[in-house]
């Protein structure tokens, strides 16, 4: 893997583009809710809903669920019978991966590139 800095190039300049929402996906990445300062009731209701969403998606596409170290064992247990959900231990700030994780762009050859959006918590960082 090679890191390309913004000073070297941009995805658009290199012929990469955001695939359509209906385009086939290799997998879906999700983050396990854990922040008790933003999720009510110790994040348990949110975890239940995220599990339901992951299971629905996994009927069609593999899901990679990222859980922090403290919640990893619990998350792994939740999905122990779900063969199309892979739980990965990863430090995350929040479960909202649209803001905090990479998104992927493609080119006409099918190559992929991950974008880092430099998210700053809506000015909070």
Predicted regions and their residues:
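The feature marks the mature, well-folded catalytic cores of soluble enzymes
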Residues: 1-125
């Amino acid at each position: 893997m090679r890191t390309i800095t913004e000073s070297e190039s941009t995805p658009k300049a290199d012929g990469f583009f955001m695939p359509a929402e209906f385009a086939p996906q290799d997998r879906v990445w999700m983050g396990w809710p854990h922040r008790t300062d933003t999720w009510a009731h110790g994040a348990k209701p949110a975890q239940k809903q995220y599990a339901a969403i992951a299971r629905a998606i996994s009927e069609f596409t593999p899901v990679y669920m990222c859980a922090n170290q403290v919640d990893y064992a619990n998350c792994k247990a939740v999905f122990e019978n779900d063969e199309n959900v892979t739980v990965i231990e990863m430090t995350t700030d929040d479960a909202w991966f649209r803001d905090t994780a990479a998104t992927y762009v493609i080119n006409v050859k099918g190559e992929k590139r991950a974008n880092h959006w430099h998210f700053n918590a809506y000015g909070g960082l």
